[in-house]
């Protein structure tokens, strides 16, 4: 039972849906960071 429980918990820990959501989250986080970086640069250019 220990082995099948390990395999089951692994499936629950890293399902394909979670992996896709994690990738989306990383992409959104990167976009948010670049947007935050671009805004101050654009503001200083306007000044």
From Swiss-Prot:
It comes from the Viruses. Keywords: Host cell membrane, Host Golgi apparatus, Host membrane, Lipoprotein, Membrane, Myristate, Virion, Virion tegument. It is found in: Virion tegument; Virion membrane; Host cell membrane; Host Golgi apparatus membrane. It is a lipid-anchor. Residues 1-47 are annotated as: Disordered. Residues 32-47 have a biased composition (Low complexity). Residues 18-30 have a biased composition (Basic and acidic residues). A lipid is attached at residue 2 (N-myristoyl glycine). GO terms for cellular component: host cell Golgi membrane; host cell plasma membrane; membrane; viral tegument; virion membrane. The keyword Phosphoprotein does not apply. The PsHV-1 UL11 is much shorter than the other family members. Plays an important role in the cytoplasmic envelopment of tegument proteins and capsids during the assembly and egress processes. Also participates in viral entry at the fusion step probably by regulating the core fusion machinery. Belongs to the herpesviridae HHV-1 UL11 family. This is Tegument protein UL11. It comes from Psittacid herpesvirus 1 (isolate Amazon parrot/-/97-0001/1997) (PsHV-1).
């Amino acid at each position: 039972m220990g082995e099948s429980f390990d395999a089951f918990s692994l499936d629950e820990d890293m399902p394909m849906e979670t992996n896709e959501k994690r990738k989306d989250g990383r992409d959104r986080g990167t976009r948010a960071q670049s947007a935050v970086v671009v805004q101050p640069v654009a503001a200083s250019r306007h000044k």
